[in-house]
């Protein structure tokens, strides 16, 4: 998913996970999931963020965009919605 390439680019550029740019990516990810798959509530996205690092299948897939991208995306989601 191209959105994760954008997360990776921000991570690699040193942009903070709670910056406006990265938080806009979180909103973009939520809208993408809602448009293409199912209604992605804040609670659902918060859970997905946790799965991005807890489930090795998610982590491996997302980290194809760059090592640490899954962790960065999860951190950004947590910054938006809390733990």
What do these predicted regions represent?
Residues 1-83:
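Amphipathic alpha-helical "stalk" segments
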């Amino acid at each position: 998913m191209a959105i994760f390439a954008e997360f990776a680019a921000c991570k690699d550029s040193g942009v903070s996970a709670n910056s406006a740019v990265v938080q806009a990516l979180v909103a973009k990810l939520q809208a993408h999931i809602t448009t293409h798959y199912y209604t992605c509530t804040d609670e659902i996205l918060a859970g997905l963020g946790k799965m991005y690092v807890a489930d090795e299948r998610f982590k491996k897939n997302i980290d194809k965009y760059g090592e640490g991208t899954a962790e960065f995306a999860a951190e950004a989601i947590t910054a938006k919605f809390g733990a």
